[in-house]
């Protein structure tokens, strides 16, 4: 199937946009779709390790789950910080992949979880959205427009 990976610092709107995106896609399509959220994954794994090694372990687990679900025909909407580019790149050659970088200058109450080692996406195909300037609906529509183009090609 396909992966839509929403990445960005904590508080940039990943979970909010993932929920909005899933609701819009479900409303118009009969498709198997799932959200893999970083907070949910950490809760399931009981992984509260925010060191580099802990983050790599958590994201590697997410990648294994995404690979499994995509092979079962699911559209995976991923809302995980995933600070390291090499991890975000891992599935790009296996499945249709839309990377969405969410950023904002607004402080939204999670500054204590700021990932100091976050690597801003360097892929020219990555969609970049400033969630401080666009509404949830506008941001969702930006992602949906690219998703629809990719879905017709895939």
Regions found by a protein language model. Give the residues of each.
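Conserved substrate/cofactor phosphate-moiety recognition/catalytic segment
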Residues: 18-64
